[in-house]
């Protein structure tokens, strides 16, 4: 089965319950060059800049060899252009690149809201308001998005394209491609490919330096985002590429290829503001 066919094998029917094994993609070798991108959070311009750098790097390092860009979830919310980013990701990738997007906790929250809009949803206070604004859904002058649920649902139906909902529903929870890629991390007491969606999307304990590797990892790496820091970094068997793009103005990726050491690529907005991801 070729790469294009593998990338079409995503689950149907939406998000699985958090306690169940999360569906993912198991890519057979030989593995292409992989560029794993951290949390974009609606910073569409930064992602476009980073993808141009990835194209340049791929051509310099690998010539015409196709590469895979893996986006590790939390593509949306907080930043200014979540809708534009999804439009860009749904468009064909440049020659020589394929894109695969994984689910993050913000995609899960957004999907829950967009499926059944609720003006009381916590998502609105965690970047969801910026996502709605990117679709042209204006807040009520007095109540913001805390408007009647029926009105909010009508606005969502009128402004959010069905293709964007299908995109969110089709996001896999993990990828195996010589290394294990996910949004937040893994639990050491479960098999590598038997992680729960709750762990893959929401785990914070993964920042513990003493955390054991999950069973079955071998000499591979777990590549993730979710826990923002000023710069992407490797810590033993883990690589965190979340550099807090919406707060720092810095979006990071890591290049992985058999036989090569991991290498980081960065796209930045001018002088970055003080680091804060509260």
Language-model regions, residue ranges each:
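Active-site neighborhood of phospho(di)ester-bond hydrolases with catalytic His/Asp-centered motifs
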Residues: 37-38, 69-73, 100-105, 220-227, ...
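DEDD superfamily 3′-5′ metal-dependent exonuclease/proofreading module
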Residues: 229, 277-278
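Active-site neighborhood of divalent metal-dependent phosphoester bond hydrolases
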Residues: 65, 78-170, 203-213
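N-terminal active-site segment of His-dependent metallophosphoesterases
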Residues: 2-86
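A short acidic-Thr-Gly-centered motif at the start of a beta-strand
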Residues: 21-30, 61-62, 90-94, 172-176, ...
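Acidic, His/Gly-enriched loop-helix segments that form or flank divalent-metal centers
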Residues: 133, 141-240, 244-250, 256-270
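Short, glycine/acidic-enriched loop or turn micro-motifs at the edges of active sites
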Residues: 41-42, 77, 108, 186, ...
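A general structural motif
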Residues: 31, 64-66, 96-98, 181, ...
